Every structure is written in structure tokens, then in C-alpha cells.
From Swiss-Prot:
N-terminal RS domain has a very strong bias in favor of D over S. Residues 1-195 are annotated as: Disordered. Necessary for the splicing of pre-mRNA. PROSITE patterns: RRM (PS50102). This is Splicing factor U2af large subunit B. Keywords: mRNA processing, mRNA splicing, Nucleus, Repeat, RNA-binding, Spliceosome. It comes from Arabidopsis thaliana (Mouse-ear cress). Residues 14-27 have a biased composition (Polar residues). Residues 29-100, 109-145 have a biased composition (Basic and acidic residues). Pfam families: RRM_1. It is found in: Nucleus; Nucleus speckle.
Length: 589
């Protein structure tokens, strides 16, 4: 280094020396060693700091890793929660879908069931309507058959009279037209049209005009004692003599007789002459002088004839001619199929006069009305107060009679308590005997058997018919109680069946028919028709119809007017019913 002189130089030297000294200090070994230590310490500290920093960094990194791990765990937990939530949502949706499907299936099942039930109801309704239509058609066919049978019978008589008088032909034509119109109108009700005399009786009774019965015979075929009243007897309403019964048309059914088994050579004129002469010979012309026969119709193919007499009494006398010989051939004399014994009893006697001189024509006095033969029935033990009409009603519960004879005292005319009868259908004979024999009638017990001993017992297939007949006899006994009086209740039997009453529409129609028909005879208070139980348990009174009237006068007219009528092809039996049993709802016999 450059050296300076003087003071100034001295300063300069001093400064330089100071720097040298300073440099000397710095460059001294101690100083270097200290510096080295410091540096080492600094490095150590720096290393520690660095290590701490590293440790802190590592801690921070660890914390961050832990935080990240926690975050991942939390995220996973949230993911699991979200997944569970989504699963729950999916389960809820599936449950809702299942519920919707179940509801849809249930609703579909309900609709299917409703449709099936509707179809079943429609099928049932169709079947019921079809059954009702079939039942109504059957009733209409039955009525039409009866109408055609009556029309054929009337037309046969008219065809024969047509040749005699054109005027009478026109009259018959008008009568036939009226009859056809009546036949059509009757289809509106289950009841048949009442015969003309019954309609007139109803009309007269409804108007309160009961004509008096004449005390002397003023009309052919009628006589003063045709309505005897015996004390203690139950007759119901007194038979009324209608105006129409005085005409030929109204009494024709009771004035005709059937003659079967005619010889091939017989004709209308020969038959008419023969029976007129025979009636005169036996004393059967009770209507006065002249021919008893007014008309004859012959069916040559079937060899039978219908012979029409002047009066009801003469027709009954002609019934005693059964078996008479006509041109060498024995002929059968019977009542025609349209003969109504209940109505005929109000027009005149229904049995031959017991004083006829049958021996004058070669017949025995015992051959009254076809009562001979193996099927003749003896009916004994009859109460003396029983009338002929009552006994016939009892016997005809089993079928129409071919002949009947109530034996009476010749002097007094009173019943001797026994009778004979023959049924048109011989198969009914044993059934009637078995059902009637032993029945109590008042203070008497009936004895009913074949008049010829050795009667055949009922066949097994007849047992059901026998049971039914016994039930009907029990009903008939209600009418024949001695000293009894008519009640306000009329019971109709043999009217309807249990099947008819199960259908509501059919039941309503039957109820309406009964109200309309029953109301014609008086003040009808109520109609009771017991119906069968749906569970098929026995129901008392099923098959019967009970008519309640305000007074006995109405019930008496109804009983007389409806007994023997036809309803739906069945013949009605009308009897009085005890008022106390009816009030208690007891409809059993």
C-alpha cells in the first residue's frame, strides 16, 4: 500500500493501520475459529430450523393427509348416506308401484267381479224372464185349449141348428163372437172367465139386488125346493138365481148329455126321436108335454153324440138311461166335459128322479146314472145335514164324477146317510177310498170302499197322489163342520205352487190377480199369500191364498163364486178359514 507523510499523512497512516489492524483481527485464527463455530452453529440452527420446518411441513402434510382422509371418509359417509337415501327412495317408489299395481289389480278384479255379477244378474234376469214367459205361455196355452174345446163344442151344436133356422144361426154367431172376446180378455188375469151365470150372480150381488126364489115352479127345469135350508147346516151364501140362467145359452152346459158308442146307422133324427120317446116312457118329461130333446149333434167318425134337453131336470133324468139299447147296441150316457156340477146345482137337480119308471124301457131301477160296475164306490156314515152339493164337492176333490146318487127317503126326501158314486177315471177309485175312509165328519165317521168287495189296494206310484188328496180332504172338512158359521176369511187352495211364488214379478202378478178377482165379491180388506223361505225351510201356508173381507157377506159370495174356478189351469178350492188362526198368522191346516 502507498504511505503518506506529514499530519495528514499521519492520519492516513493511522487509518490504514486501523484497517490493517482490523484486517488483522479478522484474519486471526481465533477469529476464524469463532466464526467457524458460529457458522457451524448457524448451520446447526438452520439445520434444526430446517428440520423443524421439515417436521412442521411433515406434520402439516400429515395433517393434510389426515384431513384429506377425513374428508374422504366424510365423503364416503355422505355417499353411503346418499346411496341409502336413494335406496330408500327406490324402495318407496317400488312400494308405491306395488301398491299401485295391487290397487290396479284389485280394481281390475273388482271390475271383473262386477262385470261377472252383472252378467250373472243379466243371465238370471234373462232366465227368469224366459221362465216367466214360458209359464205365461203355458197358462195361455192351457186357456186356449179350454177355449178351443168349448168353442168346438159350441160350434158343433151351432152347425146342426144352422140348417133349421138362419135367424138362429145369426144369433149363435153373435154369441160366438161375444165368447171369443171374453176369451181374449180373460188372458189379462190368471183366473179363467167366470161362466155367464156366475158373472150375473156377481153383478146382482154387487148391486144388492137379490131376487126372491119363487115358491112355485114357473120356469122349466126349476122347482120350489131347489134351495132347501136345513138347520145347523153350513151352506155359505144362498145361491142366487141369475137372470141369464133363465136363458137357453146360460143353461146349455147343464142341459146336454153325452151319448157314446152309437151304432153306425144312427143319425141326428133317429137319436132325437129315440130319446124323446124313451124320456116320455119313463116319465122323465118334467118340463111339460112335447119332445124332451131340442137338438142333437153327432160325430159319425168317433160315434158319439151330444143330446140337448129342454131343461136341466130332464137332462139329469136322462142320466138314468146309461146302458140303454139303441138299435141293438148298448150306449153310454154321461155328462159332457164342460159340465160344472157346482153351477148346475143352482139351476136344477143334478141327479135322476128316483121315481122314474126305468122298467118300461128294460132298465133296472138300480142303474142310476152309470153307477153299476166294479168301480162303483159306497160312501157311508154321512151326516144327515150334508147336502148333495157338499158331498159332491168332497168327492170331486179327486176328480170328476161319472155318476153320483145320494140315497134319500122316498116319503120325506131326507138323506139316509149313504151314497154311491163312480169316477170318470177308474184309476182314482182306490185313491179316493183310501183317503176318505175313516175321516171324521162331525159326529160321524165315513166308510168309503168299493161297492163290490175285494178292492185293489193303491199302487206304490199312487202314494204321492194319496197324500195330496188327504191334505185336500183336511181343507174340505173346514167347510163341513156342523153348526159352524162362515167367517170373514176365505182360503183358496190348489191355486199356486212354491215355484210361482219365488219370483218377485210373478208374485206381484198373482197378488194383483187375487186383489182384482177377490174385490168383485165385496169389500176386500187384505190378501195374504205366504211365500217360501229363501233357505228352503218349510213355510206354513205355501200354496194357499187368504182373502180377508170386511164382512161375512163378502166372504160368502167369494167362497161361492171362486170355488171350482180355474187359475193358471188349476181348479180352485175355496173354503172358510178360522178368523182367530188367521189373526195369529197361523196358516197351517
Amino acid at each position: 500500500m502507498m504511505s503518506y507523510e506529514g499530519n495528514g499523512d499521519g492520519v492516513a497512516i493511522s487509518t490504514e493501520n486501523h484497517n490493517e489492524n482490523y484486517i488483522s483481527l479478522e484474519s486471526s485464527p481465533f477469529h476464524e475459529d469463532s466464526k467457524s463455530r458460529e457458522s457451524h452453529d448457524l448451520k446447526k440452527d438452520s439445520s434444526k430450523i430446517s428440520e423443524k420446518d421439515n417436521e412442521n411441513g411433515r406434520d402439516k402434510d400429515g395433517n393434510k393427509d389426515r384431513d384429506r382422509e377425513k374428508d374422504r371418509d366424510r365423503e364416503k359417509s355422505r355417499d353411503r348416506d346418499r346411496e341409502k337415501s336413494r335406496d330408500r327412495d327406490r324402495d318407496r317408489e317400488r312400494s308405491k308401484d306395488r301398491q299401485r299395481d295391487r290397487h290396479h289389480r284389485d280394481r281390475h278384479r273388482d271390475r271383473s267381479r262386477e262385470r261377472s255379477e252383472k252378467r250373472d244378474d243379466l243371465d238370471d234376469d234373462h232366465h227368469r224372464r224366459s221362465r216367466d214367459r214360458d209359464r205365461r205361455r203355458s197358462r195361455d196355452r192351457d186357456r186356449e185349449v179350454r177355449h178351443r174345446r168349448r168353442s168346438r163344442s159350441r160350434s158343433r151344436s151351432r152347425s146342426e141348428r144352422r140348417s133349421r133356422s138362419e135367424h138362429r144361426h145369426k144369433s149363435e154367431h153373435r154369441s160366438r163372437s161375444r165368447s171369443r172376446s171374453r176369451s181374449k180378455s180373460k188372458r189379462r188375469s190368471g183366473f179363467d172367465m167366470a161362466p155367464p151365470d156366475m158373472l150375473a150372480a156377481t153383478a146382482v150381488a154387487a148391486a144388492g139386488q137379490v131376487p126372491s126364489v119363487p115358491t112355485t115352479a114357473t120356469i122349466p127345469g126349476m122347482f120350489s125346493n131347489m134351495f132347501p135350508m136345513v138347520p145347523g147346516q153350513q151352506l155359505g151364501a144362498l145361491p142366487v138365481l141369475p137372470v141369464q140362467a133363465m136363458t137357453q145359452q146360460a143353461t146349455r152346459h147343464a142341459r146336454r148329455v153325452y151319448v157314446g158308442g152309437l151304432p153306425p146307422t144312427a143319425n141326428e133324427q133317429s137319436v132325437s126321436t129315440f130319446f124323446s120317446q124313451v124320456m116320455s116312457a119313463i116319465g122323465g118329461n118334467t118340463a111339460g108335454p112335447g119332445d124332451a130333446v131340442v137338438n142333437v149333434y153327432i160325430n159319425h167318425e168317433k160315434k158319439f153324440a151330444f143330446v140337448e134337453m129342454r131343461s136341466v131336470e130332464e137332462a139329469s133324468n136322462a142320466m138314468a138311461l146309461d146302458g140303454i139299447i139303441l138299435e141293438g147296441v148298448p150306449v153310454k150316457v154321461r155328462r159332457p166335459t164342460d159340465y160344472n156340477p157346482s153351477l148346475a146345482a143352482t139351476l136344477g137337480p143334478s141327479q135322476p128322479n128316483p121315481n122314474l119308471n126305468l122298467g118300461a124301457v128294460g132298465l133296472s131301477s138300480g142303474s142310476t146314472g152309470g153307477l153299476e160296475g166294479p168301480d162303483r164306490i159306497f160312501v157311508g156314515g154321512l151326516p144327515y145335514y150334508f147336502t148333495e152339493v157338499q158331498i159332491r164337492e168332497l168327492l170331486e176333490s179327486f176328480g170328476p164324477l161319472r155318476g153320483f146318487n145320494l140315497v134319500k127317503d122316498r116319503e120325506t126326501g131326507n138323506s139316509k146317510g149313504y151314497a154311491f158314486c163312480v169316477y170318470q177315471d177308474p184309476s182314482v177309485t182306490d185313491i179316493a177310498c183310501a183317503a176318505l175312509n175313516g175321516i171324521k165328519m162331525g159326529d160321524k165317521t165315513l166308510t168309503v170302499r168299493r161297492a163290490i168287495q175285494g178292492a185293489i189296494q193303491p199302487k206304490p206310484e199312487q202314494e204321492e197322489v194319496l197324500l195330496y188328496a188327504q191334505q185336500q180332504i183336511a181343507l174340505q172338512r173346514l167347510m163341513f163342520q156342523p153348526g159352524g158359521t162362515p167367517t170373514k176369511i176365505v182360503c183358496l187352495t190348489q191355486v199356486v205352487t212354491a215355484d210361482d211364488l219365488r219370483d218377485d214379478e210373478e208374485y206381484a202378478e198373482i197378488m194383483e190377480d187375487m186383489r182384482q178377482e177377490g174385490g168383485k165379491f165385496g169389500n176386500l180388506v187384505n190378501v195374504v199369500i205366504p211365500r217360501p223361505n229363501p233357505d228352503h225351510d218349510p213355510t206354513p201356508g205355501v200354496g194357499k191364498v187368504f182373502l180377508e173381507y170386511a164382512d161375512v157377506d163378502g166372504s160368502s159370495k167369494a167362497r161361492s163364486g171362486m170355488n171350482g174356478r180355474k187359475f193358471g189351469g188349476n181348479q180352485v178350492v175355496a173354503v172358510y178359514y178360522p178368523e182367530d188362526k188367521y189373526a195369529q198368522g197361523d196358516y197351517e191346516d
